[in-house]
C-alpha cells in the first residue's frame, strides 16, 4: 500500500486496548500526494488559478478550525496532522464517567489523506489488534470497524474495500460509503446472482455466516481455505475458472480463481448442469464511484436529527452500558470517528 506512517503516540493506549478486531477504519496519508499549490506555481507560473486554489484551501481551513473550536471549546484538542484533530473529553452518564475520544478529519483541508477499511489478516476469518492493523497499513488513526463474529473474526455486514465486495449486508443494516471527496450513508441491500448458460440463481449473501437453512451463500477465497458445512439437505458447487469442477455435500476447498456456492440441493440442482458460471454482485443503493463501504448500525443521527432505529435493524439485543464506536460525517463532509468507554 502506497502510504506513509505518521506516528502519534497519544493514540497507542486506545488502540492497543481493543483486541480481537475483525475490521478497522484507518486514516492513511497517501504517498502519491499532489505537489502543493506553492510548488506548482514555481513550476508552471499559473498564479491566478493557483492563488484561487490557495484561497479556497485557506477558507476551508478556517471553517474547519472554527467548527472544532465551536463544538469542543476548551476540551483537549490535538492536531494529529493537517486537517486531522483529536479531542479527548470526559462526560458523566448516570453519575458515572464516560471517556470519549473523537477524531475529526477534513478532506478539503488535506487532500493527501485517505479513509478506508482494513481487515485483520489476508482472510476474513481472523482477528487482530487495532494497533497491529494500523501499523501494517501505515495508518495515522484507526478505530474498530463493523460488527464481527467473536469466535472467528468474520465481519458481519457489508464490507467493500477498493471497490471489491468482501461481505454482504445482514438485515439491510446501515452502511457508510466512502468516496474520493466525501461520504454517504444508507441502509444497504445485496443484489447478487450466479449467472450461467442454464439460467441464473439468486444469491442471498456473500462470505457471511448462514442465517437460514434455505439461504444460498457464495464463499470466495477471501473467506478462507474452506467453505463452511452445507445446511441440512444442502450441497455445494465448486466453481473454478468459470466452470463447475466439483459437487460436494460437505466442506469444500475454495479455488483461488473461483468460488463455492452453498445452499439447498433443490436450488443448486437447477444450475448443476451448466457449463459457464459467473458471479454478478450489485449493492443497492448503487453508489456511483464509491471506493469503500463499511456496515454498522443503528443510525444515531440522520439528516441532522436524532434517529435511533435499533429495533428496525434488529440490534435491540446490543443495548446496555458497553464501550461504543461511532462514525459519521458533517454537512461539509468532515469525517467524525468516536469511541466511548464508560463500562467501568
What are these regions (language model features)?
Residues 3, 16-22, 26, 30-344:
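Gly/Ser/Thr/Pro-rich low-complexity, intrinsically disordered segments
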Residues 1-11:
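N-terminal secretory signal peptides that target proteins for export/translocation
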Amino acid at each position: 500500500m502506497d502510504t506513509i506512517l505518521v506516528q502519534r503516540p497519544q493514540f497507542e493506549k486506545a488502540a492497543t486496548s481493543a483486541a480481537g478486531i475483525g475490521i478497522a477504519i484507518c486514516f492513511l496519508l497517501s504517498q502519491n500526494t499532489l505537489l502543493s499549490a506553492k510548488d506548482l506555481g514555481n513550476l508552471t507560473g499559473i498564479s491566478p488559478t493557483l492563488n484561487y486554489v490557495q484561497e479556497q484551501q485557506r477558507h476551508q481551513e478556517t471553517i474547519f478550525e472554527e467548527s472544532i473550536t465551536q463544538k469542543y471549546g476548551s476540551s483537549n484538542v490535538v492536531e494529529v496532522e493537517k486537517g486531522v484533530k483529536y479531542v479527548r473529553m470526559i462526560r458523566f452518564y448516570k453519575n458515572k464517567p464516560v471517556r470519549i475520544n473523537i477524531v475529526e478529519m477534513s478532506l478539503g483541508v488535506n487532500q493527501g489523506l485517505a479513509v478506508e477499511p482494513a481487515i485483520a489478516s489476508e482472510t476474513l476469518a481472523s482477528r487482530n489488534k487495532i494497533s497491529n492493523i494500523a501499523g501494517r497499513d501505515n495508518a495515522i488513526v484507526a478505530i474498530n470497524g463493523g460488527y464481527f463474529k467473536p469466535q472467528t473474526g468474520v465481519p458481519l455486514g457489508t464490507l467493500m474495500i477498493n471497490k471489491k465486495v468482501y461481505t454482504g449486508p445482514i438485515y439491510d443494516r446501515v452502511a457508510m460509503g466512502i468516496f474520493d471527496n466525501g461520504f454517504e450513508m444508507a441502509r444497504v441491500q445485496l443484489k447478487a446472482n450466479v449467472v450461467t448458460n442454464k439460467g441464473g440463481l439468486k444469491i442471498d449473501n456473500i462470505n457471511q455466516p448462514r442465517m437460514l437453512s434455505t439461504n444460498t451463500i457464495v464463499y470466495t477465497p477471501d473467506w478462507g481455505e474452506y467453505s463452511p458445512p452445507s445446511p441440512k439437505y444442502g450441497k455445494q458447487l465448486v466453481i473454478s475458472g468459470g466452470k463447475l469442477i466439483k459437487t460436494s455435500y460437505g466442506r469444500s476447498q475454495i479455488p483461488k480463481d473461483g468460488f463455492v456456492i452453498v445452499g439447498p440441493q433443490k436450488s443448486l440442482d437447477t444450475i448443476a448442469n451448466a457449463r459457464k458460471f459467473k458471479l454478478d454482485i450489485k449493492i443497492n443503493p448503487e453508489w456511483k464511484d464509491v471506493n469503500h463501504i463499511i456496515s454498522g448500525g443503528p443510525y444515531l443521527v440522520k439528516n441532522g436529527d436524532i434517529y435511533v432505529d435499533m429495533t428496525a435493524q434488529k440490534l435491540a439485543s446490543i443495548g446496555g452500558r458497553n464501550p461504543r464506536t461511532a462514525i459519521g460525517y458533517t454537512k461539509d463532509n468532515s469525517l467524525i470517528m468516536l469511541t466511548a468507554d464508560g463500562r467501568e
